[in-house]
Amino acid sequence: MKIYVVAYLAKNLGDDLFINILTTRYPEHKFYAISKGEKGYDTKNFKVYSNVYMFKALKKFQWEKHLANHYDAVVTIGGSMFMERGDTNRDFSLGKNKRYVLGINFGPYKTQEYYNNIHNMLSNVEDVCFRDKYSYNLFKDLPNVRQAADIVFSMDMSNIKNTNRKRAIISIISPKDKINKKYKKQYEEKMLELISFLIVKGYEICLMSFCKIEHDEEEIEEIYSKIPENQKKKVEKYYYNGNIEEALNTIADSQLVVGGRFHANIIGLCLGKSILPVLYSDKTLHVLQDMQIDTPIIDIRNLESFDIKSITDDDLTRHYDVEKQKEDAQRHFEKLDLQLKKT
């Protein structure tokens, strides 16, 4: 079958994992998508038409739904795919074919109108599977709505080389891109304090970018430039460039993951690492609450209330059993499996 994919194609590690999981699960089917211009996604069964002008025209004039009618099914796969951003009156439908909306959370949103638009759209698709109970509870009146653990938990990481190196992977985000530039100074100060704190405890540090387009790399350079010279020898940088296996092996070569990116925390958990989440929105919090994970949380929106020195050695070495989540995450695909006749 030919499947049209709606996803965030921007060389973002978390979203690239979604695509990898989807296309690997159904190797006998062909997947197609259109990106704003990002290249390097094509595989045996995934073709991306990379054209910024075509992408903008499809979105602006709502031609995408007509294009989608030429495919056997439509799969929307991602995390934060439905955020209001002021677009309260869009037509969210996408053609007449069966549409599957997988792995998402809802929000943030501000108006009832936006919620109603999404509620109406989701009521007309074949299957919706949220990754958190908060989002599910907003739409649970719909018979086609389900909830399962984040899709990345379903990924086979058996080929990844896991170590116990005393190293902390710190996933850095750009506050001005992800939340608000007013938090930038405080965020950088807190990350510098955390880096020093971990180095004193004997950790090596790797500052990791998940997405260049969202300015992770720029923020890393700014933070790195402010690290004292006597500490820089303990700090390295890793910039994700589309090589998923390399990125996962980088994270696996550690004991601790400081997760600014949502999926830094999920990958850390999958690989059996201790995690220290850094929040810029509630989406990570909702998932951690669903999993009943008890760990210190650094909230960028409330940095002044978090004391780095309150982090204990137990916090830095706590591990979590996520076998249940790894199995549960497979359920995102149970309806699509039927459509694509996977047994």
Regions found by a protein language model. Give the residues of each.
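Active-site anion-handling motifs in enzyme catalytic cores
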Residues: 1-343
